[in-house]
């Protein structure tokens, strides 16, 4: 009986180690908690994110231990990629956003229009209206498809006055 318990404990420990390795170095599940990526990713969507696409850092490990500030086997993401990162403010909160700027790019929002490297990003209204939950209020806003200079596109959300409203600003280390 004691041998069987020891075998079961070993099996559980091996399973936990394998799960930790997969989650840390291969794929990690994420949950979409807000409407900031609608209509592409909806509230409640679940997805697996590749951990090896852009290399490894201390954030690849659970609890982001301060072992190193370097990134290993790194590759820069491309403009238009959906990325997951930890905000530098608390180093714990995961954000899922679309990348529109690369190192060296200049990004400006002038009168509600997006400029990338002094180039006004052209936008076409998408034939949908998005409902965004803002506390106790639900906003109906228009969605626009914006064409980036390298041919990739992303969806930006504007309010009724035409001002971009999904303008979260983060500086994310390479």
Pin down the residues of each PLM region.
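Hydrophobic membrane-insertion alpha-helices, especially the h-region
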Residues: 10-27
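Aromatic-capped interface at the extracytoplasmic side
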Residues: 23-37
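Soluble "head" domains of membrane/secretory-pathway proteins
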Residues: 2-6, 21, 36-174
């Amino acid at each position: 009986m004691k041998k069987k318990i020891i075998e079961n404990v070993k099996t559980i420990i091996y399973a936990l180690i394998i799960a930790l390795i997969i989650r840390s170095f291969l794929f990690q599940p994420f949950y979409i908690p807000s409407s900031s990526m609608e209509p592409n990713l909806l509230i409640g969507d679940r997805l697996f994110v590749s951990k090896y696409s852009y290399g490894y850092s201390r954030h690849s490990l659970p609890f982001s231990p301060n072992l190193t500030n370097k990134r290993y086997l790194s590759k820069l993401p491309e403009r238009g990629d959906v990325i997951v990162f930890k905000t530098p403010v608390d180093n714990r909160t995961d954000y899922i956003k679309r990348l529109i700027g690369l190192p060296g790019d200049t990004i400006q929002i002038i009168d509600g229009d997006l400029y990338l490297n002094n180039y006004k990003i052209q936008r076409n209204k998408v034939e949908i209206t998005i409902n965004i939950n803002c506390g106790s209020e639900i906003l109906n806003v228009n969605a626009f498809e914006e064409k980036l200079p390298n041919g990739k596109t992303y969806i930006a959300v504007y309010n009724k006055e035409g001002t971009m409203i999904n303008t979260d600003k983060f500086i994310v280390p390479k």
